[in-house]
């Protein structure tokens, strides 16, 4: 088990929480499961009262404390010889102004796995930047990354580089990735699996009102999204042809979700305003006149709705481009 940083939300979590977490980690070690923990930036080791400084002596498994990249453990894991490389960012000691390029590799027999709580490329706020070219040249069999909460994978040289993501979300802006990341090292290479984890789902759904012609259609879309186990935020976008009230929608449909938010980001267009725009000698005016001709020529309700939606989409695109 590899923890690539930010096990805790802060460097000095409540002691009761620390003891519960350490007891759970100890169960892994007692079961013969290898464990490596790398501090992150939320639970940074820099501080004198950091949880990792306070519990360094009795932390289960391998605790990374060195401020620069180095070999932190070599041993048998799952019947294979494995060499682990990592660092614990330490303010004032760990180089952070430019992406790290000094990435060691002993060349010894066995697998070589790097574990970094960092970001690929240039530095971001409160991040440890890692040089892509250096990671690719280091020749690791696998690179486990933390810091970015969204799951992602890429290959640098022969090395698979993986962000597992945050398993359980913290909110709508950080919804999490409800999967474990399981890495299998076989004779033919590395196989990465992402089995699902049963956690509460956090979703952000978008409904484009330009496609809808009545409040009833909107209600049907919301009903279709219902999930009593999920936190859901619905964003209403596009150009609306009818009146809506986000609070009323929440009131009518909240029982279909564990938690429901509706945010109205739509625009509405007054028919009289469209008519005035259509009389103008502008690109927008010419577009409105052309679509008006199509509306008048429509022979079926389907053709009329298609022309109406095209008009609204076009006006919205012209507004955004302006």
PLM region spans:
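Glycine-rich phosphate/diphosphate-binding loops that line cofactor/substrate pockets in enzymes
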Residues: 1, 30, 225-227
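Beta-strand-connecting loop/turn residues
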Residues: 6, 158-159, 188
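N-terminal active-site segment of His-dependent metallophosphoesterases
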Residues: 1-24, 308-322
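Conserved residues at the C-terminal ends of beta-strands
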Residues: 4, 146, 237
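Short acidic, S/G/P-rich loop/turn micro-motifs used as interaction or catalytic elements
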Residues: 8, 91-92, 239-243
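His/Asp/Glu-rich metal-coordinating catalytic cores
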Residues: 11-162, 166-171, 175-179, 184
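Accessory, non-catalytic peripheral segments of nucleic-acid enzymes
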Residues: 187-322
């Amino acid at each position: 088990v590899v923890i690539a940083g930010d096990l805790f939300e802060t460097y000095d979590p409540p002691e009761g929480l620390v003891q519960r977490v350490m007891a759970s980690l100890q169960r892994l070690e007692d079961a013969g499961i290898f464990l490596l923990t790398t501090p992150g930036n939320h639970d940074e080791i820099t501080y004198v009262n950091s949880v990792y400084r306070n519990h360094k002596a009795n932390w289960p498994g391998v605790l990374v404390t060195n401020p620069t990249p180095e070999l932190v453990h070599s041993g048998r894991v799952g019947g294979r010889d494995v060499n682990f490389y990592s660092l614990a960012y330490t303010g004032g000691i760990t180089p952070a102004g430019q992406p790290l390029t000094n990435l060691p590799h002993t060349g010894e027999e066995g697998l070589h796995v790097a574990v970094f709580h960092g970001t690929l490329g240039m530095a971001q706020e409160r991040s440890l930047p890692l040089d892509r070219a250096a990671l690719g040249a280091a020749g690791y069999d696998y690179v486990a990354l933390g810091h970015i909460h969204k799951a992602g994978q890429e290959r640098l040289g022969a090395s698979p580089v993986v962000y597992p993501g945050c398993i359980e979300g913290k909110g709508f802006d950080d919804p999490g990735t409800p999967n474990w990341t399981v890495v299998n090292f076989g004779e033919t290479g590395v196989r990465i699996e992402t089995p699902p984890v049963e956690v509460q789902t956090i979703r952000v759904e978008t409904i484009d009102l330009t496609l809808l012609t009545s409040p009833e259609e909107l209600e049907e879309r919301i009903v279709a999204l219902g999930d009593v186990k999920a936190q859901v935020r619905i964003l209403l976008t596009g150009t609306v042809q009818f009146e809506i009230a986000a609070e009323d929608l929440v009131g009518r449909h909240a029982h279909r979700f564990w938690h429901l938010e509706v945010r109205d980001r739509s625009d509405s267009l007054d028919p009289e305003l469209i008519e005035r725009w259509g009389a103008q000698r502008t690109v927008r005016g010419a577009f409105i006149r052309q679509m008006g001709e199509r509306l008048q020529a429509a022979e079926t309700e389907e053709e009329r709705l298609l022309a109406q939606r095209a008009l609204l989409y076009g006006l919205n695109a012209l507004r955004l481009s302006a």
